[in-house]
Each structure stands twice: as C-alpha cells, then as structure tokens.
C-alpha cells in the first residue's frame, strides 16, 4: 500500500534558489552563472512576500545568505531542501527529464545567434518559401508576429525563431500559410534536427490569425518533440497501471510518454492552477500522480529580465497555494520545485544554472523540517518508492524522511 495515495508535483518554471556548484561552467552573455540567484536577487532587489510557501519552509532552505524578505519558520508545516542538477544542461527538457530520473550527458543544442544557414536553406528548399532572416534569433512569440506578421502577409515568407530552450518555432498566419502546410514544414524541420549540430528538443508550429496590430495565436499549435532516450518514472507508473496526470506543457516535454491523463496547455499560471485543482477534485483521480508546469515565471519575466513582474507572479502563485492545499486529501503529498534558474537581475536573457527549491506538504505529516540536500532525480526516486515501481536511471528516495 502506498504511503501517499496521491502525489502532486508542481514545477515553478525557472524559480532557482542560488548558483549551483558548477554554475561557472555555464554562461549568460559571456558572464559565468556563478553569481546567479533567482529567488535571492528578487527578494533582495524588489522584495518577496510569499507567506504560504514560507510556512512550508521556503525561508529555511540552507543558503549562505538567507532570503532577505522570506523569514525562516521556527515550526514549518512542511519539509524543505534544495536540489542540485547533475545533467549537462540548464534547459526545460533537461531539468524535467532529470526530475523524472534521467541523466542527460549530451545537452540539447540552443541557438542564441539563430539557426545556421544550412538549416534555413533546407527548409526553404523543402517548403518553396523563403525564411525571414531577421526573425532568426531568440524571440518572444507574440513580439515576433507583431514585428514580422505584416511582412509575412505580403510575401508568404516563413517566420522561424527560437528561445532559450532547444526549440525551433515556425509562426504562420492561417490565411497565408494553411495549417496543414505549416504542419508538413514542421515535420520536415523535425526530421533534420534529430542529431548534432542541431539536436533540438521540440519543433513548434505556431499558427496565428488577425490583422497587423491585432494578431492572435490560435489553438492549432502543434509540438513535435522527441521522446526521452530511456524510460522515466512516468513510464514506470503508466506501465503499472497508475494514473498520471499532466498539467501544462508536461506532456509536450515528455512527448506524451508515460502520461495517461493530459489536462492540456495552460493559458496562464492561474489557468494551470485551475486545471490542477480540477484534476485533484475529479472523482476519477483516486490514486496516482499529477505533474504540473507553471511557465509564466520563466517565459514572461525571467527571460525578459523583469524582477518586479517575476515577484508579482510568485505572489500570485502563493495566493493560490491555499486553494491547492484545500483540494488535497489526508493521504496526499504536495511537492513544489523548479527545473532550473532564470535570474531576472542577471546578465543576458538565458536560464541560469542554479539549485532548485523543494517543498513538501501533506495533511498527514506529524513532523516537519529540513531534509538533506540532494539531486533533481531524488524526486522521481521518491515517487517510485511510494508507488512501488522501479526508479529510473538515477536518484535516491527520501520517502522515509517525510513523516
């Protein structure tokens, strides 16, 4: 019998808690990540008021300098620690795959200066359409169509852009480039980005509609991912007949592998919390695991180096936390963590190599406090231990510490 009948894992995308020991091996605009500290710098520069996460023990997590505006609790209601990444990467897929038990020794490729001419030329030859070279760089998905949508409507050229993650995105106005044609072009792009020098995690079709100054992305988005290179704990749970719920982009990150209930994409963090609560309160979800990603911290504020917006986004989540806890059953376990850092006060616009926080709470807890500093994959090992399935490649369970 499982110690916890249901386990719920929430990834606060990019909410790091201080530079990892190997952070200087990773850079942002030529600056090593060694001084990065997402939560620490937000707390120090613009203040951070997250009383509900503080109650769980966020301010108790060991650091050289305590979080300036997040107090330590003398009697927290949960367990807390920080976790270190062993994989060679600081992107979304690497972080999530390691959380589910994989060690990524070959990082995906990212393209801060845009995709090489060879890739663009192959796509042009296949599609019969030119590529707008000026868009070929890391770009906000809404800004890129605002900037180049009018030109695409006139010329029929492709808008190809990337981000901090290993992705190639193609935006196309549905009246100019039909959705099915866009999908075919993306499938070709997927076929030429499966190995170095362009090993990409996802190809994303980004259809949109509207007129210049009023473009809107549609629900016809399609993600062409690659599956994890080895079974994750999600696969182990699924094979054992245990329910696995995905909220947000989790299913995309794992290419649907190991997911048997997908709650769909989130329109916002708040929408993601709504979807999580919908899953938690479903009569069908009696036993199993839910896995949620809330991406607004990263996508809207981390990459854009907006500490005030990032802080407000954290406040917004913290205000919803009591609702999540209220949806828990007595023998549920809630876990809150991250997948990498993205310090909004740091150089550049890329992710930062950081420890991630880990908070755990159950109404059944008799004790609370700190658990030893571990690694990302310890989360999946703990989940596997709880449900009596085999763990994946790496990770050590701390299930016995949660009492």
Curated annotation (Swiss-Prot):
Coiled-coil intervals, chain numbering: none
Pfam family, one: Metalloenzyme
Tagged with keyword Cell membrane: no
GO terms under biological process: 2-deoxyribose 1-phosphate catabolic process; 5-phosphoribose 1-diphosphate biosynthetic process; metabolic compound salvage; nucleotide metabolic process
Keywords carried by this UniProt record: Cytoplasm, Isomerase, Manganese, Metal-binding
Primary location class: cytoplasm
Reaction(s) this enzyme catalyzes, per UniProt: 2-deoxy-alpha-D-ribose 1-phosphate = 2-deoxy-D-ribose 5-phosphate; alpha-D-ribose 1-phosphate = D-ribose 5-phosphate
Binding site for Mn(2+) 2: 298, 303, 351
Cross-referenced NCBIfam families: deoB, PRK05362.1
The protein's name in its UniProt record: Phosphopentomutase
Species: Streptococcus thermophilus (strain ATCC BAA-250 / LMG 18311)
Lineage: Bacteria, Bacillati, Bacillota, Bacilli, Lactobacillales
């Amino acid at each position: 019998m499982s110690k916890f009948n249901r386990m719920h894992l929430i990834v606060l995308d990019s909410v790091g808690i201080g530079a990892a020991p190997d952070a200087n091996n990773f850079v942002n605009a030529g600056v090593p990540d060694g001084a990065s500290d997402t939560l620490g710098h937000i707390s120090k520069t613009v203040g951070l008021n997250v009383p509900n996460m503080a109650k769980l023990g966020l301010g108790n997590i060991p650091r050289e300098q305590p979080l300036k505006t997040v107090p330590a609790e003398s009697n927290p209601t949960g367990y807390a620690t920080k976790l270190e990444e062993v994989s060679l990467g600081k992107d979304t897929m690497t972080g999530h795959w390691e959380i589910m038990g994989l060690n990524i020794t070959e990082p995906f490729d990212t393209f801060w200066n845009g995709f090489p001419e060879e890739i663009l030329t192959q796509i042009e030859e296949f599609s019969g359409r030119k590529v707008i070279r000026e868009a070929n760089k890391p770009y906000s998905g809404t800004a890129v169509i605002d900037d180049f949508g009018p030109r695409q409507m006139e010329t029929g050229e492709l808008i190809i852009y990337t981000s901090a993650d290993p992705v190639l995105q193609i935006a196309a106005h549905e009246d100019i480039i039909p959705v099915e044609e866009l999908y075919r072009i993306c499938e070709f792009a997927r076929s030429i980005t499966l190995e170095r020098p362009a090993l990409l995690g996802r190809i994303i079709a980004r259809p949109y509609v509207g007129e210049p100054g009023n473009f809107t992305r549609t629900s016809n988005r399609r993600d062409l991912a690659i599956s994890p290179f080895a079974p994750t704990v999600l696969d182990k749970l699924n094979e054992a007949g245990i329910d696995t719920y995905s909220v947000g982009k989790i299913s995309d990150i794992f290419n649907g592998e190991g997911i048997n209930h997908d709650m769909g994409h989130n329109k916002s963090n708040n929408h993601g919390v709504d979807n999580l609560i919908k899953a938690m309160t479903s009569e069908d979800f009696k036993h199993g695991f839910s896995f949620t990603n809330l991406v607004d911290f990263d996508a809207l504020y981390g990459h854009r180096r907006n500490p005030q917006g990032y802080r407000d986004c954290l406040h917004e989540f913290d205000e919803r936390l009591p609702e999540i806890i209220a949806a828990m059953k007595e023998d549920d376990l809630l876990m809150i963590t991250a997948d990498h850092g993205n310090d909004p006060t740091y150089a550049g616009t890329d992710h930062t190599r950081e420890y991630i926080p880990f908070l755990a709470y159950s109404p059944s807890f008799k004790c609370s406090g700190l658990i030893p500093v571990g690694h990302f994959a310890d989360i999946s090992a703990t989940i596997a231990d709880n449900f009596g399935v085999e763990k994946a490649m790496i990770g050590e369970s701390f299930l016995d510490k949660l009492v």
